């Protein structure tokens, strides 16, 4: 096929320049990208600062830097072309469309540099009109004036405050320098595979622990990295100044990274690596007791609990004990308290302390028997977070799997029927529970058995106690379908239960009658005053009252 035939049967790519330029307008017309690009241009030009001034009366924004200036205005307004040196091109990778954000941010734009200037509108660029290069009295680096700027002063000020936080050179707004707390030069940190990383609590004196979310900057400007960037909380979070040759911002606004999910994973690895180095150093310099107590939480969150496996001390934060009479839990309730003392491996090995895995009540029927024994035995529960190789794991017992033996002599029994629960009540002499070969006498009532359909529940009450109504909370939460605690119902049931226990304990009949009459409010019945009655109960409890 000859060349002419080939050309007639082939196509090449092309660009509709005017349409392309017109569509760029939709990307930049209301964006604060103009501010970010102006900052970057000033920094690349070697400026020592970038100054922004806004004339509210004229809606005019002036941007001035003292950098090297513009050698060729043509490159400034040519898409995908840059006037930067080859060295800057290689190190900065400018894309070549940033200045168009300036062009579309105002009705007209004036650019002055090295005693020359150009003035144009976005329509001039779209129509590819001739733009004259004229003399200017401005000799410094670069001054850009946006007449009738489409951004108001408030929006400009807010955006600059955000952009300046991590920027490399000073930024001035309306004559005042903006704070740059996250600037690389103002931070202590570590150079990592992802770039420069500052970790509060390690690289400064702030009392904070491991944080998995933080702030990310690319070439000094903030970028959003889904899965890592923090959108809440204060300033005290990790700060990452990414290696911009490795992580490319997404065009045209450069406010996020390409492949943010991978970037977030990389940042997580870098953060955890810094924490591991820090914790290894702390382990070497601190006592075992201080190390586990101070560093356990951070080690857990940073995935470094393997550093704890050979430390012969368990911290208080992983240890709990039954600190009060166990009951069915409602929201916020807990009968488990954190231990006030650490536990050493030596105490566990010697048998002075018994360790159990975390215990979850599952209405097995004897859960509260086990927990009441645990309260008496002062055993400690260890949270599930122990790594599998930790020395304590081999010493952990499972309270749910231990054989339970309940002993004692029944001295009296009856049935209780309340508004929320019912069951047999047994008054016990020498009520004892044996688990793991250790026996303890119980001095409080305990509910055993299940309230499920077809099952029975029994309340075991040690002889000698006078109030045991609280045991009903082991059988029911007394919470209705609206999650409301029915306290009055509980108190009524508890009083009735205590009355039954008193009778089983041998309360004289006259005292029982006196309580019944008192609770019925008979003292307020004026027609009963100065009268005597004979009260009789038959074998079925039927009452007969005769006036005397």
What label would you give each PLM region?
Residues 1-11, 58, 68, 72, ...:
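Charge-rich (often acidic), low-complexity intrinsically disordered regions concentrated
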Residues 55-61:
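Short beta-strand-loop-beta element adjacent to the nucleotide/active-site pocket used for signaling
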Residues 1-11, 109-111, 127-173, 179-180:
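Flexible, glycine-/charge-rich segments associated with ATP-binding catalytic modules
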Residues 68-129:
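Flexible ATP-lid and adjacent glycine-rich G1/G2 motifs of the Bergerat
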Residues 154-161, 166-275, 304-349, 358, ...:
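GHKL/Histidine-kinase-like ATPase module
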Residues 1-40, 44-47, 73-77, 251-262, ...:
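Bergerat-fold GHKL ATPase/HATPase_c domain
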Residues 65:
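Conserved active-site aspartate in kinases
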Residues 48-55:
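A conserved short beta-strand within the histidine kinase catalytic ATPase domain
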């Amino acid at each position: 096929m000859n060349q002419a035939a080939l050309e007639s049967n082939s196509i090449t790519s092309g660009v509709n320049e005017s349409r392309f330029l017109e569509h760029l307008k939709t990307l930049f017309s209301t964006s604060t990208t103009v501010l970010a690009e102006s900052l970057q241009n000033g920094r690349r030009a070697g400026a020592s600062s970038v100054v922004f001034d806004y004339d509210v009366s004229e809606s005019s924004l002036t941007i001035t830097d003292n950098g090297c200036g513009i050698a060729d205005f043509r490159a400034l307004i040519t898409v995908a072309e840059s006037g930067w040196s080859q060295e800057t091109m290689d190190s900065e990778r400018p894309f070549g469309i940033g200045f168009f954000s300036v062009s579309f941010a105002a009705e007209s734009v004036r650019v002055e540099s090295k005693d020359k200037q150009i003035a144009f509108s976005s329509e001039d660029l779209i129509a590819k009109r001739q733009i004259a290069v004229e003399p200017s009295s401005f000799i410094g680096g670069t001054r850009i004036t946006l007449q009738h700027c489409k951004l108001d002063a408030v929006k400009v000020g807010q955006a600059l405050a955000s952009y300046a936080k991590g920027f490399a050179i000073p930024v001035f707004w309306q004559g005042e320098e903006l704070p740059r707390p996250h600037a690389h030069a103002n931070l202590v940190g570590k150079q990592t595979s992802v770039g420069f990383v500052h970790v509060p609590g390690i690289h400064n004196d702030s009392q904070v622990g491991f944080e998995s979310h933080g702030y990310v900057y690319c070439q000094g400007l903030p970028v959003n990295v889904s899965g890592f960037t923090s959108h809440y909380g204060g300033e005290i979070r990790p700060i990452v100044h990414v290696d911009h040759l490795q992580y490319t911002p997404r065009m045209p606004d450069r406010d996020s990274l390409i492949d943010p999910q991978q970037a977030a994973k990389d940042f997580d690895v870098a953060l955890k690596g810094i924490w591991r180095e820090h914790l290894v150093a702390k382990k070497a310099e601190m006592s075992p007791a201080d190390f586990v107590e101070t560093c356990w939480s951070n080690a857990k969150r940073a995935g470094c609990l393997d550093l704890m496996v050979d430390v012969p001390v368990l911290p208080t934060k992983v240890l709990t004990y039954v600190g009060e009479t166990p009951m069915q839990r409602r929201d916020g309730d807990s009968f488990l308290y954190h231990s006030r003392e650490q536990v050493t491996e030596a105490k566990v090995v010697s048998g002075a302390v018994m360790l159990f895995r975390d215990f979850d009540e599952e209405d097995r029927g004897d859960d509260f028997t086990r927990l009441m024994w645990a309260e008496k035995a002062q055993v400690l529960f260890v949270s599930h977070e122990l790594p599998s190789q930790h020395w304590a794991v081999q010493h952990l017992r499972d309270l749910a799997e231990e054989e339970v033996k309940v002993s004692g002599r029944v001295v009296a029994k009856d049935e209780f029927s309340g508004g929320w629960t019912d069951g047999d009540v047994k008054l016990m002499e020498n009520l004892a529970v044996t688990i793991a070969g250790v026996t303890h006498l119980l001095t409080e009532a305990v509910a055993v058995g299940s309230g499920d359909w077809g099952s029975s529940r029994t309340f075991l009450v040690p002889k000698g106690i006078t109030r045991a109504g609280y045991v009903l909370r082991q059988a029911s939460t007394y919470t209705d379908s609206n999650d409301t605690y029915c306290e009055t119902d509980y108190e009524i049931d508890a009083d009735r239960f205590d009355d039954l226990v008193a009778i089983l304990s041998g309360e004289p009949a006259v005292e029982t009658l006196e309580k019944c009459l008192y609770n019925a409010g008979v003292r307020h019945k004026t027609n009963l005053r100065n009268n005597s009655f004979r009260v009789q109960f038959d074998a079925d409890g039927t009452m007969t009252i005769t006036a005397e």
